[in-house]
Amino acid sequence: MWLFALLVTLFYGVEGSIYLPQKLYGEVTSPLYPKPYPSDLETTTVITVPMGYRVKLVFWQFDVEPSEGCLYDYVKISADKQTLGRFCGQLDSPLGNPPGSKEFMSQGNKMLLTFHTDFSNEENGTIMFYKGFLAYYQAVDLDECASQPNSVEEGLQPRCQHLCHNYVGGYFCSCHPGYELQKDGQSCQAECSSELYTEPSGYVSSLEYPQPYPPDLRCNYSIRVERGLTVHLKFLDPFEIDDHQQVHCPYDQLQIYANGKNLGEFCGKQRPPDLDTSSNAVDLLFFTDESGDSRGWKLHYTTETIKCPQPKALDEFTIIQDPQPQYQFRDYFTVTCKQGYQLMEGNQALLSFTAVCQHDGTWHRAMPRCKIKNCGQPQSLSNGDFRYITTKGVTTYEASIQYHCHEPYYKMLTRAGSSESMRGIYTCTAQGIWKNEEEGEKMPRCLPVCGKPVNPVTQKERIIGGQPARPGNFPWQAFTTIYGPGGGALLGDRWILTAAHTIYPKYPNKGKNTNPRTLVFLGHTNMEQIQKLGHHPVRRVIIHPDYRQEEPDNFEGDIALLELENSVTLGPELLPICLPDNETFYGQGLMGYVSGFGTTGNRIPFHLRFVRLPVADREACQRWLWTKKDTSPFSQNMFCSGDPAVQQDACQGDSGGVFAVRDRNRDIWVATGIVSWGIGCGEGYGFYTKVLNYVDWIKKEMGDEN
């Protein structure tokens, strides 16, 4: 027993302090716990937690010799230079002063636990053994900002001059608006030179309001809110700034600026009127001198979305879509025009228009105007013209014109079933385009009228040797010179129907003419006059593929087309002939006319002549060829005309001209044949290319111009 006491004395000492490591939690026990503690001992355990925390201590086991007033053995708890209690006994015993479940709390970060034992533990002569105690401690946050009237530990009470903010393990200080925290982190000094307010509403006041404001201030309170908002200011009572009865604001003054303008300088005891600044940026400058005891000012600022003026149309044709009772920042409106009118921004035509309300309360673009759509001058019509149905010269929306062709030489091409009343009528639409109800934007076409001479030949008797033609008798007649004089007939307004052998003649020992000089004359019955009119350049020469130049006696496929470089202008002496469409044009005895500048009496006439001939019997023509011992093929692509008894026929120079027959049912003239070949001049029958058999080929080559 004595050895045990010696060891304890050596470890703890009779009197001494035990410093526990600084931790956030831990446990404290009596010496040798849970074995009985030694006698005659006094130790102090120092519990320390980090700064900014307090110490909380709770006993879980407590078995210390009980005594009246805990005079023998005891545990004493101290903190903040105060004794929190002196305890002995057992936790559940009424003897002594046990701590029970009480929590002990320090105000600072340190707590002292002193354990004292006397020289013995006897009770009525019997030695008693006590286990001592087991306690747990932990660090809890210290609210440095809380009022601590009982704290006596120096430096514990925070010294924030204005505002104190607690956090776990510490605190920090801040200042009222208009003051600046000093380097000591606790004291505040007036500083209001750059106060900024960005909330959409709030309060702004002078320092210490409603207490007297400090002297020598140079304050700048800036309100900056989102673009598109406007700030409203409402001053509250009391309003009190030093002033003078005779001089305006000589001492202290409040100045208000917005949009670069001074909205006023205020002082005295009359609060300013409510102000709508029409700006999202407002500055309040507050200056004070070195003296005075006025209470200052306070205002409540609010914001609302800035408004733009109501849009107004500049003319009666402008339509503002879905107008609103008011327009605010970022709102927009769209504008259209009444049908037939065009949006115009200056001189620029617009497809659409939208204006947006800007942050400064203005529209981002000016209101446009609506100008009536103008379709412009109608296109000129080839071989036709137009007239105004509505006011002459007016080409704007709903104006109407009517195209017409130069009749009787041209007629307007229309689709099947189209209305006669709407033919050629075009109206200026709301889109600014001339349109026909049936044809749309497509321009009308004036097509040549075929087979309608204004002065048709009326001779009914046969004429021996032919006779001169009068102007307009055969307006389709063409005079060609390639290797010699020849004839042809006008188809449409740019094609010449002729015989292939006039271009590639069947001369022995002559190669194909690959680049003939082809001259075409049109529009007169007099040779001198027709040449004065000038020749028409040829763009293309098209020979039928069945034609064989190298076979001198074979006139199969003796047909050709000349495409002129330019269309000719039709008139009374220049009209096309029609193409046949049935076999009735080839009946025996049917009379036809052949015209040309062919040889008469071994000379070329100076005037167009014609002859009236009947379609001959095919078998008679074939027998006549046999009598002449002519072996030239007389195919189904040919026919013959004439009468050997009267010695009428086409002659040299007439080749390529056409055999013209009048269709009495339709009152048109048709080219049923082309002067092709024969034996001599006026000695019997003449042979012609049968045009009906080549109509499909002709139409194919002419395309949409046939």
UniProtKB/Swiss-Prot annotation:
Localization of this protein: Secreted; Cell surface
Domain annotation Peptidase S1: ranges: 463-703
Leading EC class: hydrolase
Activity: how regulated: Activated by the C1Q subcomplex of the C1 complex following C1Q binding to immunoglobulins (IgG or IgM) complexed with antigens to form antigen-antibody complexes on the surface of pathogens. Immunoglobulin-binding promotes autoactivation of C1R, which results in the cleavage of the Arg-Ile bond in the catalytic domain.
Annotated positions binding Ca(2+) 3: D242, D252, D289, D293
Site (Cleavage): R462, I463
Alphabetically ordered keywords of this record: Autocatalytic cleavage, Calcium, Complement pathway, Disulfide bond, EGF-like domain, Glycoprotein, Hydrolase, Hydroxylation, Immunity, Innate immunity, Metal-binding, Phosphoprotein, Protease, Repeat, Secreted, Serine protease, Signal, Sushi
GO cellular component term, pick one: extracellular region
Domain notes: The CUB domain 2 shows a compact folded structure in the presence of Ca(2+), whereas it has a flexible, disordered conformation in the absence of Ca(2+). Ca(2+) could provide a switch between the folded and disordered forms; low Ca(2+) could provide flexibility to promote autoprocessing and activation of CIR.
The name this protein goes by in its record: Complement C1r-B subcomponent
Organism of origin: Mus musculus
Gene: C1rb
